[in-house]
Amino acid sequence: MNQEEFARRIETVRKKLYKTAFLYLGNETLALDAVDEAVYKALCSYKKLRELDYFETWITRILINECYNEQRRQKRFGGFEELPETAAEEFDSLPLKEAIKKLPKELKDVIILRYFTGYTLSETAELLKIPQGTAATRQRKALKLLKLELGEEVSE
């Protein structure tokens, strides 16, 4: 893969990457920064990618790691509260979003990747580097906790 092909592949997944980062970080600016950092890291090491078929999985894994790094930075430096800049940020106050934030990290990861980013169960397992059965179990546990938290029916 050369740089032109790398750029073309990035353009095909950029929106999905942003959506994933936004769901992890809950902030437009942080999400854009995380995507940029992930793309930069991928650009620096794209020649190490052995299977081009796994490009999307590979870049998404880099992005998730970058989101984790940003979350750690926010905890360490005590992120600041911002007023919503756009109507889309009002989504942060929705009960589902709040319930998802309360989930343990390993359950939240599965829910974000499965239901908000659209990955299959096997792709989710691959991205999280866990067996598919473990991903399915975490999905069931997360849905059960969300159902309890929201007090309503959550479909599988």
Describe the function of each predicted region.
Residues 48-50, 61-80:
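Arg/Lys-rich amphipathic alpha helix in sigma70-family domain 2
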Residues 69, 76-100, 120, 155:
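Internal acidic/polar
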